[in-house]
């Protein structure tokens, strides 16, 4: 297996890292540039620049101060139950960061002590060697804690933790595109199996040659959307189609969309959002007609939706029915809103389905797969189609996202 870092990746990364309006931004981006390239090729964690550590320390001090304020507030007897609950909720959010901060502060105190020991042991070689060794280990642990804290401070996308919907569609290239769509769909199925994810086929529309015009699946597992979201876009294939008599290489394209699965919609009706009127039913007469206000009309004020029920003799039963109908209608509105949002996301992700705007090229004659966003080429295409080595591209793209977040972290501080 060979992995190549293409020159355009290096130049694009340098241009990216040269952006920024402040000198410390440019310095940070320069550090990120060299570390990002090194991390792609070695899998090592990026080193933290002095500028970044200084910015992070300011954030950590603010967290420590806020934690101290909240701890003091919840111990005050005049604190109301509502304020106590809010403070406790915020403290829970700070808990993991505070554990890391406390570990970091303890390690930094240990480092200060070891530095003093080193300076005092210059005449005792054995003691000096022992102190230097412990100091080196402590410094490495400090770096590890700083890296963990930095990652904990970066903004997180709530959707990353969700399951996802995979949609694959044949684009430019006719039957060959549909055959490649089938290959890619099966690649993700094999990859999901290797990751231990649940892969449930939702729908498949076949072409005349049993390729896939469209195919979709629900993929469930830990942080599935966060791992697969970078697969969205145009995937291009270059190979000799099985229908090609003269052996010419054809270029086709398919689109892949990765959508976060929405949580089941819960319709919560607040009393202040409802206007409930009762009136006499307009039945055909008889003992209960027009004698009691059993009919119920409910208006949902935020939407103006109205439901009237007078089928039952009991006002209580009519009210329950009306609420059930109202909930069903509001649920449908929300479901359609989510569907519309997904459609927009899908459109943004896959574009027109032609070969422009491609994110990855699969060149079968040369046995290579190239991701154009990070300039990485992998020379083992058959393994790739079996669901192997996809993590190489995913991890590189996750790293790029992390570096973007770090750069944003510094520029907004």
From Swiss-Prot:
One Pfam family it belongs to: PCRF
UniProt-listed InterPro entries: PCRF, Pep_chain_release_fac_I, Pep_chain_release_fac_I_sf, Prokaryotic/Mito_RF, RF-1
GO molecular function, one term: translation release factor activity, codon specific
Keywords assigned by UniProt, alphabetized: Methylation, Mitochondrion, Protein biosynthesis, Transit peptide
One term under GO cellular component: mitochondrion
Tissue: Mostly expressed in seedlings, stems and adult plants, and, to a lower extent, in siliques. Barely detected in etiolated seedlings and roots.
Name assigned to this protein: Peptide chain release factor 1, mitochondrial
Organism, scientific name: Arabidopsis thaliana (Mouse-ear cress)
């Amino acid at each position: 297996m060979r992995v190549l870092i293409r020159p355009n990746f290096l130049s694009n990364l340098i241009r990216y890292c040269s952006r920024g309006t402040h000198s410390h931004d440019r310095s940070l981006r320069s550090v990120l540039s060299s570390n990002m390239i090194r991390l792609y090729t070695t899998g090592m964690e990026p080193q933290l620049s002095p500028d970044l550590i200084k910015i992070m320390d300011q954030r950590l001090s603010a967290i420590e101060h806020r934690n101290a304020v909240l701890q003091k507030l919840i111990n005050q007897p005049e604190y109301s139950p509502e304020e106590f609950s809010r403070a406790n909720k915020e403290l829970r959010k700070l808990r993991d960061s505070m554990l890391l901060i406390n570990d970091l502060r303890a390690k930094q105190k240990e480092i200060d002590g070891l530095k003093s020991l080193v300076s005092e042991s210059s005449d005792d070689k054995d003691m000096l060697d022992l102190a230097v060794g412990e100091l080196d280990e402590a410094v490495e642990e400090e770096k590890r804690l700083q890296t963990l804290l930095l990652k904990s401070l970066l903004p997180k996308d709530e959707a990353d933790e969700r399951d996802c919907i995979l949609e694959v569609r044949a684009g430019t290239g006719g039957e060959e595109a549909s055959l490649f769509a089938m290959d890619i769909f099966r690649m993700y199925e094999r990859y999901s199996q290797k990751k231990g994810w649940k892969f449930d086929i939702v729908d498949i529309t076949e072409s005349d040659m049993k390729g896939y015009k469209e195919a979709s699946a629900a993929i469930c597992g830990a942080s599935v959307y966060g791992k697969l979201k970078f697969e969205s876009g145009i995937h291009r294939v270059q190979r000799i189609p099985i229908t090609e008599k003269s052996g010419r290489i054809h270029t086709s394209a398919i689109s892949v969309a990765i959508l976060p699965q929405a949580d089941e919609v819960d319709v919560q009706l607040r009393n202040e959002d409802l206007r409930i009127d009762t009136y006499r039913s307009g039945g055909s007469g008889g003992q209960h007609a027009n004698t009691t206000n059993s009919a119920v009309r409910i208006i949902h004020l935020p939407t103006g939706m109205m439901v009237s029920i007078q089928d039952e003799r009991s006002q209580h039963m009519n009210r329950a029915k009306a609420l059930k109908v109202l909930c069903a209608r509001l649920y449908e509105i929300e479901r359609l809103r989510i569907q519309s949002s997904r459609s927009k996301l899908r459109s943004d992700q896959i574009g027109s389905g032609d070969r422009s705007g491609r994110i990855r090229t699969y060149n079968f004659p040369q046995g290579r797969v190239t991701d154009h966003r990070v300039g990485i080429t992998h020379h083992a295409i058959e393994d790739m189609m079996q669901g192997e080595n996809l993590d190489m591209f995913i991890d590189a793209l996750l790293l790029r996202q992390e570096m973007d977040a770090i750069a944003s972290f510094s520029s907004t501080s």
